Amino acid sequence: MSRVLIIESSARQQDSVSRQLTQTFISQWKAAHPADQITVRDLAVNPVPHLDINLLGGWMKSAEQRNDSEQASLDRSNELTDELLAADVLVMAAPMYNFAIPSTLKAWLDHVLRAGVTFKYTETGPQGLLSGKRAYVLTARGGIYAGGPADHQEPYLRQVMGFIGINDVTFIHAEGMNLGGDFQEKGLNQANAKLSQVA
């Protein structure tokens, strides 16, 4: 049995294309791997606080030095990190907001990219500690940006995943969602075709 962790980050609910992609992924994954455990963390429904002084204090201070706010922030970070550590497969659903990822997803990443936990510093440079995991990134974009200079999603997330040791990363883009007509239909068809090959 494998454990799948899904991170939803779209602010939209019913009309969200990235959420539609997630549901397709879940349906196909369950059909192929009925025994697997799937956990969904919805950052729009339950937002993760952005990196602040309490979280930094929670990381850097000893248990005796932490105040209640710092301890609460550390506990939250530990919960999020433990979910990631336990997962064999990570799925991030990310609409493109202003050429990048939603700030809620960035906040989640800030909680789980932790020295000594998901990566470590060595004499030869940083080393990721999550090797052996797979990641899928499901994106929805109003325009067509893949491979171009305006795409600040894929390069950033590839860098982040590689930094923590996840090098097996598959991106599935639904592009042209705001262009209407044939563009939208083509974008969805291409994304769904790639999803059908995932499981």
Curated annotation (Swiss-Prot):
A GO term, aspect molecular function: oxidoreductase activity, acting on NAD(P)H, quinone or similar compound as acceptor
Cofactor mode of binding and number, as noted: Binds 1 FMN per subunit.
Pfam families: Flavodoxin_2
UniProt-annotated binding residues for FMN: S10, S16, V17, S18, M96, Y97, N98, F99
Enzyme Commission number(s) of this protein: 1.6.5.-, 1.7.1.17
Keyword Oxidoreductase recorded: yes
Needed co-factor(s): FMN
Keywords linked to the UniProt accession: Flavoprotein, FMN, NAD, Oxidoreductase
SUPFAM superfamilies xref list: Flavoproteins
Keyword ATP-binding attached: no
PANTHER family: FMN-DEPENDENT NADH-AZOREDUCTASE 1 (PTHR43741), FMN-DEPENDENT NADH:QUINONE OXIDOREDUCTASE (PTHR43741:SF2)
Quaternary assembly: Homodimer.
Its job: Quinone reductase that provides resistance to thiol-specific stress caused by electrophilic quinones.
Protein family (similarity comment): Belongs to the azoreductase type 1 family.
Name of this chain's protein: FMN-dependent NADH:quinone oxidoreductase 2
Naturally occurring in which organism (per UniProt): Pseudomonas fluorescens (strain Pf0-1)
Lineage: Bacteria, Pseudomonadati, Pseudomonadota, Gammaproteobacteria, Pseudomonadales
The gene coding this protein: azoR2
